[in-house]
Every structure is written in structure tokens, then in C-alpha cells.
Amino acid sequence: MITNHHCNRLLLNLSLGMAVAAAGCSTGSRGGSEADSSPLAVWDTIEVASSQEWFSLPSYMTSQQIVNSEGDTTVLALNYRTNSFDRINLTHNRFAAPIVLNREGPDGITGEIIWFDAFAPDSIVAYDEVKVYLLDTVGRVIDSWQLPGEPIPFVTRNAQLHTAEMHFIPSERSILYPARKEEQMVIERLDLSTGETDEYMMVPGWTGERRGFMVYPNLTFAETDVITAFPYQAAVSRISAGGDVTSQTAPMKLMMAECGECAPDPNELMWHSLENPHFGEVVWLPEAGLYAQIVLGPTNLEGREDPQKASFDRNFYLRVFDRNLNTVMETDLGAGRFSPYGGWFFTPDGICFYGDNPLTDTSTDENAPTIIYRLTLQSAD
């Protein structure tokens, strides 16, 4: 099943057309000064042959790397076309039987899942903008909890808006999630034992400012800390459960642009999202001891004749931060290789990209392999 598998130990795989720059930064209340060295980056490329039994996708908007019950490293990927979790076994480079979800009946999930966490080999928690579900690995709904209408959750993964996640704490049987409470942003806590919610913490810094489609910040969790990064600017903040804030406010060095204002016209809003950068969520990589972020640059296409081509002709940038949010790496990954619509996912020690972009991959073969470029990071500390 393995058609190609290679691994090169180097700071960057130049065959992918990349350039890397170690960048110092200025920080806010608790950040350090300048980074001393870039982390070690190890790339490997995996091609997984398509299955004759199950319909797979060239890339998936929502994925998670897990270890299955046999101890194999596996990608659990949400397939919106088949309403299932596809399973890509990276240990043996093959697709395994998917977890098929139901739309109706006692195990029915009526909405579209926008977040999930496979926290154990046999258990998944998932959210469809209405309910939180506890699922097993055959797609049965073991339990479910409906979130209250207020405060308003803003959990989503959208390449034009923002990415904001939930955070499941198995030891407490609780889920943290971001919500809007009147003119403030808060983290709510759902107690799975009682189904009750309460306010966990306030999140400072949100003003309701709008830049095109973008209003809310990207928001992720690093254990009990909250990491925020607005999609229209380079700044990053970490808020502890006690309210202490660490900020990184230095601009990028490889791409200086930030999003400007936009007229409230539908066509202008669409082009604003393509002609401006989009700063993605900042994710803690516990095994690497680093934070990482993907940034989409403005489209390279001149003119406004082809919005679809413009959306795929965008440079990808990788930013890496140390524990104190000092920038330790900025990397230009180039354009035309990955999908800007969520075609990547973070792992405990790095990031994976699906090889999927219509500008360079013109194949119409439904049996084409799924290609994953895997980057493993290691802190220089």
C-alpha cells in the first residue's frame, strides 16, 4: 500500500520550495526577548493508496491525529460527503473502515459536526452547533447535551471567519468553549455529569471590531490556558485561568501585511478575504514544547476575474513560537500545494498538510492517493 515514503532530516525540505527565517520579536507582559535558534524541523511525505471499499477525499477540513487501540498512529478525518469519520492509518499507510454517522434515529446527529476530540481509542466527543455528543467507534450516540442559547457559542472552523475550538477535560468530565455574552467574550464550562453550564473565565481584548468577514478571534486551549489570535493581525495572546496575559505583538517578517477595512458590499467582502492575509489559530504542541500557526497570504493573482483561482493561489506561512511566545521560526511554504480551506491539522509534535490544490493537481482520477506532508518540530531548548 505504500507508494512513497521518505524522510529527510534537515531544517527545511528545499524540494518543497521553502525558505525559513528565524525571527526575533518584541513581547508584551510576560514574553521574553529574542529567540536564540530555530527548532529542528523534520519532513516526511506519505502517500496512502485510495481504498476500493470506501470513498475518501484528497483533503479534509477537520482532522485529528490519534493512537488507535492497536497502537497505530491514525488520522481521524471528518468526511462531509459520506457523513463519516475516515480513518487513515499512518503506521501501515492504508485506510481503515470509517466510522459512519447517522442523521436520524436514536443515534442521529442532525447538524454538521464542526469540532471533535477522539480522547480515547473507543470514545469521541463531537459538536454540531446544537449539541455535544459522546460517540463510540461504531458511531453510536452514548450521550448528548444541548448547549443553552445564551451566552452564544462561536465555535467554528472557517477559512474566511475564524477558528475557535472546544476543549474537553476527561478528568473533570467537562468541556470548555468560547461564547459571546452581550458585549464580552467568555469561556463557558459544560459539566457533562449534570448538563449544567457556568462561566469559567473572561477573555479580555475583544472589542467587536469587524474586518471584512472577521469579527471573532481564533481561540484554542493549552491545558487551562486560552490562546487568542485575531485572524486579521499578527498579534497573539495567552490568558491563564487566573487572568495573567502574555502577548506577542511583533509583526511577521516574511509578510508584513495585515487586513485593512472593507466596505459592507457582498462582492467587496469576498475579495477582501482573498486580497488580505488570514492569520490562523495558534496551537500548543505539547510534545514539541512549541506553539504553531498557519497564515494565508494575500492572493498572488492579479485582477478580479477568477475568485476560485485567487483563493487557491495564496502562499502558506508557518509561524513557530516558544513557550513564552517568542517567534523562533517563520517559513514560507509557497503556493499551489495545499488547500486553503483547512487542508492541514496540528499534531502533538508538529503539523500535517494534505497535498491538495487544483492549480497544481489537475488529476481527475478518483483513485489517486491521499498525500500527507508531515512536519515534526523539536524545540532547540
Residue map of PLM features:
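C-terminal motif of bacterial Sec signal peptides marking the signal peptidase cleavage site
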Residues: 22-24
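Structural signature of eukaryotic scaffold interfaces centered on beta-propeller domains
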Residues: 62-70, 114-119, 160-171, 215-222, ...
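Loop/turn-rich, solvent-exposed surfaces of beta-rich toroidal or solenoidal domains
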Residues: 274-321
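Beta-strand-rich domains and repeat architectures in extracellular enzymes and scaffolds
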Residues: 52-85, 289-296, 301
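Conserved blade-ending motifs and adjacent loop-strand segments that build the rim/top face
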Residues: 252-265, 326-347
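Beta-propeller blade signature
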Residues: 184-193, 308-326, 367-380
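A short helix->beta-strand "capping" segment at the edge of beta-propeller domains
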Residues: 33-61
